[in-house]
Amino acid sequence: MHDLYKLFILKIALLMLAIFSFPIVHSQGNITGYVSSESNAVEFSKVSIYPIKKNVLTDSKGRFKFDDLPFGIYVIKISSIGYASITDTIEVSQIKPNINCNFKLSQPIMELDDIVVTGTKTYKRKTNSNVIVNVLSGENLQVLQSCNVAEGLRFQPGLRVETDCQTCNYTQLRMNGLAGGYSQILINGRPIFSPLTGLYGLEQLPVNMIERIEVVRGGGSSLYGSSAIGGTVNVLTRLPRKNSFDINYTYQNINALSSDHIVNGNFTVVSKERDAGISLFLNGRRRELYDHNEDAYSELPELNNNSFGISSFYLPKKNHKLEFSISNLNEYRYGGEMRQDIETHYRGQAEERTHNVWMASSDYQINFNKNLSSLIAYLAYQHTSRDHYTGIFPDDSSEIDVHLSNPPYGLSAVSTSNIGLQFNHKLLDFILPGTNVLTFGSEYLYDAVVDEIPAYNYDIDQSTQDIGIFLQSDWALLPNLNLLSGCRVDAHNLVDKLIWSPRVSLLYKLKTSTQLRLSYGTGFRAPQAFDTDLHIAFAGGGISRVTLSPDLVEERSESWSASVNYDKPFNKFIMGFTFEAFHTSLEDAFFLQPNGFDSFGLLFEKQNGQGATVQGLTFELRSNYNRKVQFESGYTIQKNEFQNPVEYIDGVAPIKRFIRTPNHYGFAVLTLSPNKFFGMNLNYVYTGRMLVPHFAGATNQITDEIVNVDSFSNLSFRLSYALEVKKSKMIIEWFAGVKNILNAYQDYFDIGKNRDSNFIYGPAQPRTLFGGIKIRSGKL
């Protein structure tokens, strides 16, 4: 009887446990899903679920899963780079505890709202950024048949890349007409592109290492310190996103006279857990010398370039991320007399350089406080070593003996280090209902340049140190009104006092299609040698060199800009425009004062002038029909003048206008993609008339003068056809085209060894035929 009673109690207990535990066992469910686009899985899509604020990434098959979800209503948001985000509401209940759903992503008709970082040092949508940020993707660089960064930046509004030496072809970037030393080049957001590296660096960075390039015009010293007066160009290298590879070969024939071979490849591996990945790029280039005027001296130098690098990420734990990249650029460059049978220092005129450049950077980011706060620690380093020769073989027998006993070979070494911390915090309901993202940071930048040619008594030994502290407030006053303000304080070893660089910018969004912006910013340039100052040119039958005035002080700037951005989407069509007015005032502006001759050639001294003004208008127009026809263009009208006339050549009347700066320039790009197999690109670059100094010395140039050179229209096109190899899961693409169809190239060059090597302008190369093949993983 007692045992029966115990058994009855046990059965009752088990029954009660089953009854009360039923809702507990079944009060949780799961959501699984599949993300695709045009029948293809989209891996590494970010899947967010609200209100629990949990994020996962889709796997290599496009699938994701949320486990152990309490019954309730959830909002799922899917976002992926290159696709329009989508949102859906899903209910998990006792009736349907396990939900399986499919999401189809679509590519936007036109990329108008990329996520950018350069304008504020925080990630924001372009339409939400107080500062206009233009984006040039790695894919667009390849469609434009750009071999390097220098060729791609021509297709950005307000930007010009010019070749400034007939012998070595060094380049500089002009933003709103300001010379290269006024622009800050960043690699993954870090200012390690040193002045000496900048001489040839834009040509040494291959396009296949690049994820995208972000461009901010106007003063940026409040975030990036010295030299960001004209603007900032941020080169972002490829990060691994999925397992993939691509191999590309291109052959170029320059005006039926010289060959150019380019081979590059990319290989990417990502772990199954998607917590680590590595991307490798390789590039090789061999270009022959090119002589345009048949004087046996080159207009395009020989190039022998090899580069490689890796970019990687690792997620050691939740909300922690480590990014690391390292690359090596190795280049041999020779221009001058086209003789191969004698050593370099026996040739009539020659510039020979061998560069070995290492660049590395590392970022560690921690997100905390429910993702309202983040801390970023970063370190970046660059080292360039260079062997070089710059010389003219003399005519006089006594000078020949001196030349041969001590030929003008030289050595250069540059090291740049950057270390810093950045803290971001998002304040909710800050004073008004809006949010405010506060950014505070500090960084240290060290740059050491040694450049010497003993034969010329030329010795540059420059070390700069800069400690910067910056504070920024990104305040959403109202849903359609945003105020961005901030200030940076720099302590520079070449400047006696602290440099304060404030900025403020107002963004007003008129509905969803229009953004109005008004910005003010200040900047400075330290009294140091920049890229063009470190270039020894040929002029007047000798060489020319630049020295710094002992009284040189920092240059200051104030910049204003106002813009209207409008984009109107329709069912299958979108069109838009951007109109911007800009004005920059320079105080104590740098200029080169002719300073006579010595036994080696011309001398110039860098001095401070009284002031200068840069102002103008930039207009952009864009449209896209159903992702099959896309048009983009930009045109700039500007006026750049010194306050007082500047003497560029001794004995030639001074002028106020900036040299080598046209008042009108622009570009246009038309891309046709009628189907997934065929593609066509037609692009155009216009360069207006400008003033270029021309020194005497060559046999065909007997007077010093400033020349108002002709305008140029550079038209190019590219055709491509792709074929899918389904068994191998590969795509093979053939492409061909012509650069500079109209052969719009400088038609008058100096002749012989005593030429003025800086008298070069217009398009970088004459008509060039190209063709190639690309093999990559994936599906059409």
Residue ranges and their predicted role:
Residues 36-38, 44-50, 79-83, 97-142, ...:
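Short, acidic, small-residue-rich periplasmic hinge/interaction motif at the N-terminus
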Residues 133, 150-191, 211:
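Extracytoplasmic beta-strand/coil segments of soluble accessory domains associated
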Residues 194-196, 209-211, 222-293, 301-308, ...:
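Outer-membrane beta-barrel translocator/receptor signature
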Residues 265, 374-390, 509, 517, ...:
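Membrane-embedded beta-barrel scaffold of Gram-negative outer-membrane proteins
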Residues 287-307, 313-375, 382-415:
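Flexible loop and strand-edge segments within Gram-negative outer membrane beta-barrel domains
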Residues 478, 576-577, 582-585, 605-696:
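Gram-negative outer-membrane beta-barrel transporters
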Residues 587, 631, 677, 686-696, ...:
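C-terminal beta-signal and adjacent terminal beta-strands/loops
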